[in-house]
Amino acid sequence: AAPSKATVGESGIITPGGRLIQLPHGVSIILEGPSAALLSNGDFVTYESS
């Protein structure tokens, strides 16, 4: 079974559904919630529904 929350590291995110998202150089996660993450460059990553 897939984990119920994202795994977040310095260089990327593994979403609850198993999707790997690599962060651009110098970009970090400034806010993480149960369904998305806000990045320091203003972008956001929406996690897929489980």
Curated annotation (Swiss-Prot):
sequence repeat ranges are: 6-23, 30-47
Q: Which UniProt keywords apply?
A: Cuticle, Repeat
Please give the tissue specificity annotation from the record for this chain: Calcified shell.
User: InterPro entries from the xrefs?
Assistant: Cuticle_1
Record's superkingdom?
Answer: Eukaryota
Which GO molecular function annotations are given, in alphabetical order?
structural constituent of cuticle
For this protein, the record's Pfam families field holds: Cuticle_1
Does this entry carry the keyword Repeat? yes
What is this protein called in UniProt? Cuticle protein CP498
